[in-house]
A protein has these predicted regions:
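Short, small-residue-biased leader/transition segments that mark boundaries at the very start
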Residues: 3-8
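Conserved catalytic core of nucleotide-sugar-dependent glycosyltransferases
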Residues: 9-59
């Protein structure tokens, strides 16, 4: 299957946007430009160097440190809100996308369902897969790729009390007493 290509020659950053109103009022720019998560970025280094983005960040921080809450992410959004592109969802599939509370967006955004089933980059934005109590539906993908590195077989050491508490919490989900925060990916696979 052929992937659509995007030109970022005259842009600086590619990512997926956010709708949090507070970001725009704090950083003082219009919501129509959106806000991006800086955890996964594709950066045009030529643009970055030519426009001295690093110096701009330093100057902005010194002048407006009271506006900065999310460090580099806020700085980049405040400075580059007009100079970014958004890539397809599959290049930055975040934890939120797998949450039940977000599932209505799967119908709203073309490509999101495909991204959930076949992500190019998984961005674990909440509990990390190495956290014993992580219940991310693709937690095992992390360990699959970890096992392809020199750290093969490395797993976190979990104390007995944490194992018992987490086991009890998982039992609540398994028995249906508590509803999972995450979607069931099998439901999306069957609908294809």
């Amino acid at each position: 299957r052929r992937q659509r290509q995007m030109c970022i020659r005259d842009r600086c950053i590619e990512d997926i946007g956010s709708d949090e109103e507070e970001y725009y009022s704090r950083l003082q720019y219009d919501k129509k430009y959106s806000y991006f998560n800086a955890g996964v970025l594709l950066i045009n280094l030529k643009y970055w160097r030519e426009h001295k983005i690093d110096e701009m960040c330093e100057q902005y921080f010194l002048a407006h440190s009271d506006r900065i809450r999310f460090n580099d992410q806020d700085l980049l959004n405040a400075l580059l809100y007009k100079d970014k592109l958004f890539v397809p969802f599959r290049w930055n599939v975040q934890d939120t996308f797998y949450r039940r509370t977000y599932s209505h967006k799967v119908k709203e955004h073309s490509g999101l369902k495909e991204a959930l089933l076949h992500p190019a980059i998984l961005h674990y934005t909440n509990k990390k897969p190495w956290n014993y109590d992580s219940m991310h539906p693709l937690k095992q993908e992390y360990f699959k790729y970890l096992d392809m590195t020199p750290w093969k077989g490395t797993r976190p050491i979990i104390d007995f009390q944490t194992r018992v508490i987490t086991g009890f919490k998982r039992l609540l989900y398994i028995t249906g007493i508590k509803k999972s925060k995450y979607i069931n990916l099998k439901d999306y696979e069957l609908a294809q």
